[in-house]
């Protein structure tokens, strides 16, 4: 969803849905692996293309798993009803119908299926002149990919952080979470167990 504040975050307007899955949420969820929702959204302003891009996790029929995909809005405010989902080649799929409140199918981002996962954190890195994405795989490994345009992504690499399991990465620099330079910090959940217990950790990521 999307909402707006005109007083620096003190109060917020009622949110509106901007992206949705193909099926309504059932009263009794069918369980893992079924497509009833989207999550893990990370929204960035792509200045070169003059669009908002939302990277998120959604169930994709191909390959039958939750994958990272994306949707964009050309509206400066990113208003409800303006987002189109990725169709594998362009942004043409309806994000959320105003009447049904359902959206079109989710299509995976090519190359990122090397490691299926979610919770993307995306930042423009002006040192290397590329977009950088980190996310966790469903096997609880943190992966990193880069893109020149924010659309076509390189095959990700799995980072060896020393922990047996790591999830929920976020890129933060001295400039914030939208842009960064040669060195940025990556915060993440380390040593997460099946009960969800974990510790906060961070690593310095240096680009060359």
Task: Locate each region found by the language model.
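Flexible gly/pro/ser-rich segments immediately N-terminal to CXXCH heme-c attachment motifs
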Residues: 31-38, 43
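Beta-propeller and closely related beta-sheet repeat lectin domains
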Residues: 39-42, 118-121, 165-176
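Beta-rich carbohydrate-recognition and catalytic domains
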Residues: 1-33, 47-115, 125-165, 176-208
């Amino acid at each position: 969803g999307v909402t707006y504040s005109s007083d620096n975050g003190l109060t917020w307007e009622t949110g509106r849905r901007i992206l949705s899955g193909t099926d309504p949420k059932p009263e009794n969820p069918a369980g893992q692996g079924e497509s009833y929702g989207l999550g893990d959204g990370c929204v960035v302003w792509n200045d070169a293309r003059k669009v908002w891009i939302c990277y998120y996790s959604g169930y994709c029929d191909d390959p039958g798993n939750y994958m990272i995909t994306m949707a964009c809005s050309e509206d400066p405010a990113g208003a409800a009803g303006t987002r189109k989902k990725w169709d594998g080649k362009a942004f043409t799929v309806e994000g959320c119908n105003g009447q049904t409140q359902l959206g079109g199918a989710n299509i995976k981002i090519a190359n990122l299926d090397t490691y299926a996962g979610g919770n993307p954190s995306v930042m423009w890195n002006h040192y290397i002149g590329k977009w950088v994405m980190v996310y966790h795989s469903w096997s609880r490994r943190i992966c990193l990919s880069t893109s020149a345009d924010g659309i076509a992504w390189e095959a990700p690499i799995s980072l060896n952080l020393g922990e047996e399991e790591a999830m929920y990465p976020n890129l933060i620099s001295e400039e914030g979470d939208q842009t960064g330079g040669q060195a940025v910090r990556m915060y993440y959940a380390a040593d997460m167990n099946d009960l969800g217990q974990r510790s906060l950790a961070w690593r310095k990521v240096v680009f060359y």
